[in-house]
């Protein structure tokens, strides 16, 4: 990243898979040190830790280590719809006690959530969380945009999106359409038209090449709670 001419006044973020650091042969601490230098030597501002519920406790060490290096730290809890709300509240309370996580993200990993489950999830998090909340939606059932906008209505501050929904399997919330909706709701000063040429030209070609996006297979994977990697393997 240091070799790139990056725009200034932009916060740059990366996401790491907690499971890979926890399972590193040299230990979790060594894994963190191998990947990250001190913030003062890096263009990265934010590190987001993606984790499953079973690894939450082990993420505290990773989060504290990254904070000591000078990074802002977010947590991304995956497969949120498979966690009952009492367990979710307990997890959020634990993470709150760490005092080092700036934003608590939840991921609709199977793309099978709806506005009701989004609402229930946000309420469960808010009951134990004093800071910002984020959502990472998947578009298996075509609900990513609606779920993202609903999450904002329910009080979520951070919404993930990519151009043309670029992402694994069915993809994620489409940035160009999300910005149109947000601008229409007067939630900020955005200019979605500026993205249209990039989406229609460069990213359209990338989508044809890498073939991400909705299909009946990904829809059915959401219906039956099957991880999208199994569909990709098919």
Question: Which residue ranges define each predicted feature?
Answer:
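Catalytic cores and adjacent flexible loops of soluble metabolic enzymes
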Residues: 1-234
């Amino acid at each position: 990243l240091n070799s790139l001419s990056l725009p200034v006044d932009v916060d740059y973020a990366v996401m790491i898979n907690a499971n890979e650091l926890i399972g590193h042969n040299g230990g979790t601490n060594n894994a963190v040190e191998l990947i990250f230098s001190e913030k003062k030597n890096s263009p990265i501002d934010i590190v987001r830790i993606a984790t499953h519920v079973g690894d939450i406790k082990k993420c505290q060490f990773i989060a504290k280590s990254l904070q000591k290096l000078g990074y802002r730290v977010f947590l991304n809890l995956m497969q949120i719809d498979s966690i009952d709300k009492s367990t979710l509240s307990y997890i959020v309370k634990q993470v709150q006690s760490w005092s080092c996580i700036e934003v608590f993200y939840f991921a609709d990993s199977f793309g099978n959530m709806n506005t009701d489950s989004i609402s229930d999830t946000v309420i469960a998090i808010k009951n134990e969380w004093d800071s910002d909340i984020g959502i990472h939606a998947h578009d298996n059932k075509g609900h990513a945009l609606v779920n993202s906008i609903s999450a904002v209505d329910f009080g979520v501050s951070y919404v993930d999106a990519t151009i043309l929904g670029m992402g694994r399997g069915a993809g994620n919330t489409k940035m160009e359409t999300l910005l149109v909706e947000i601008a229409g709701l007067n939630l900020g000063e955005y200019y979605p038209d500026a993205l249209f040429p990039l989406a229609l030209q460069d990213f359209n070609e990338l989508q044809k090449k890498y073939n991400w996006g909705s299909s009946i297979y990904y829809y059915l994977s959401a219906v039956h709670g099957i991880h999208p990697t199994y569909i990709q393997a098919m």
